[in-house]
Amino acid sequence: MTQYYLSKNYNVLNNAGNKAKTDIEEILSKLGYKNAGLPQTTYSNKITGFLITLAGVLKVLFTISANNVVVVQYPFKKYYSFVCNIIHLKRGKVITIIHDLGTFRSKKLTAEQEIKRLSHSDVLIVHNNRMKEWMESQGYTQPMVCLEIFDYLSPSVNNNTHEPNQKPIKVIYAGALNYRKNKYLYSLNDVMSKWQFELYGKRFEEDKIKDKTLFKFKGFVPSDQLIEQVSAHFGLIWEGDSIHT
């Protein structure tokens, strides 16, 4: 039995989604998995990227054979069901690693549509038990494994320290900063006026903030550089509309 993963074209590498996916490709390669498609590329042109990824998907037809296992990362946009069908046509098995569910993130899929799509996989690797329970509640019946913590690969080391009683308490947030995506950030004035937030990312709408002294906007910083330079008591990972959810 040979184990594979499927690479693709990533139009940009300096965002959280693609960083996570390319890290997984690197980890799988180090574990002895082979790339069933074309080599990883980073063309920003959408047409070029589409053609390269499609060619990589079609190459799977000639790469794998019966009883081979292929790891596919989800979402894989328009290719996911197609590539799963190709693998099963060759009598192989599909393991899917979930990064995001369209039902929640983009809301372009209903739960029923997403479950139907993911049912093409033989095994799912999901974030945690909450996601597993949700999948089961929506009718998913295939085996699932919980990944739990999802970390980055990075050669960077952070040697910054903070004393527990050092004031003000500093919190780092890195991610989408626009009001539409993370409305809760703009409500933190009401509950955390004695803390200080350092924000890394793009499209921060400073004009919507009541007390601008609560935030320090640092702009976008590549992930390895961010790991090396941040200095705070806590890091916050959250996306949402409300401070109450």
Segment roles from a protein language model:
Residues 224-245:
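Nucleotide-sugar-dependent
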Residues 46-122, 126-133:
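Extended catalytic core of nucleotide-activated donor transferases of GT-like folds
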Residues 155-224:
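Conserved catalytic-core segment of nucleotide-activated headgroup transferases in glycan assembly
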Residues 7, 31-47, 198-204:
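A short beta-strand-loop structural module common to alpha/beta enzyme folds
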Residues 122-136, 140-158:
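Donor nucleotide-sugar binding/catalytic pocket of nucleotide-sugar-dependent glycosyltransferases
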Residues 1-14, 40, 236:
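Nucleotide-activated donor-dependent transferases that construct or modify glycoconjugates
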Residues 17-31, 188:
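Short amphipathic alpha-helix
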Residues 6-22, 180-181:
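A short, glycine/small-residue-rich beta-strand->loop->alpha-helix junction that serves as a flexible
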